[in-house]
């Protein structure tokens, strides 16, 4: 049975559970549940603190886990990213009072407060900057106001918390993060377990594709087909079928959801009709 770690709270928890549900896996009904078994899919889910997941996975006790890229790197655990999931995107930045610094070179001799000591210390060392790092668990924005540090380093999603604290980001981003699937470095030697892991990854990849694309169908005159296909090439090739009316064909292809309205406009201008899109709920490519 595959053993998988899932975030039990925070910004990763809800979207992770939603993605797993879309992939056909049972999820907990009560937030207090720490473990559930999905017997039909032969998977056991463990709901853990997001910051601890990389440690559990690297120990080999759990096969794979869903966590943040920033948390994986900060942990220093013997685990690696195997699939980005496209949600909980954020940027890790330095911030301070206006005028404190313009770039990382201005941090020499200063103190940086952060909840991600591993990431920050390595970034400073790699940049040749001699600065002190103070570890705080959450709400690092107050560190400057209380005189604990001159600068903070934190995850920035909207920047609202920083602005409310009178702080501004500066310099280049330290890193960009998102939710990822991780596993222990060197895992994958057991063929039976590897088969289950790959099936799990295919399901999640199917969800990602289903969220990104829609299926588009339309009717088109045969003489305009090449131009129409150029607008809707599909992932490999569109499906084309002759219609009862001579000189007309039906076309079906997957198109990026974000571009669907523009493509429909272009097809209509080309003379295509009966243009419609259908949501994709699951797929395997």
Curated annotation (Swiss-Prot):
Feedback inhibited by histidine. InterPro entries: ATP-PRT_HisG_long, ATP_PRibTrfase_cat, ATP_PRibTrfase_HisG, HisG_C, N-reg_PII-like_a/b, N-reg_PII/ATP_PRibTrfase_C. It catalyses: 1-(5-phospho-beta-D-ribosyl)-ATP + diphosphate = 5-phospho-alpha-D-ribose 1-diphosphate + ATP. Pathway: Amino-acid biosynthesis; L-histidine biosynthesis; L-histidine from 5-phospho-alpha-D-ribose 1-diphosphate: step 1/9. It holds the Pfam family HisG. Its main location: cytoplasm. PANTHER family: ATP PHOSPHORIBOSYLTRANSFERASE, ATP PHOSPHORIBOSYLTRANSFERASE ATP-PRTASE. Catalyzes the condensation of ATP and 5-phosphoribose 1-diphosphate to form N'-(5'-phosphoribosyl)-ATP (PR-ATP). Has a crucial role in the pathway because the rate of histidine biosynthesis seems to be controlled primarily by regulation of HisG enzymatic activity. Belongs to the ATP phosphoribosyltransferase family. Long subfamily. This is ATP phosphoribosyltransferase. The lineage of its organism: Bacteria, Bacillati, Actinomycetota, Actinomycetes, Kitasatosporales.
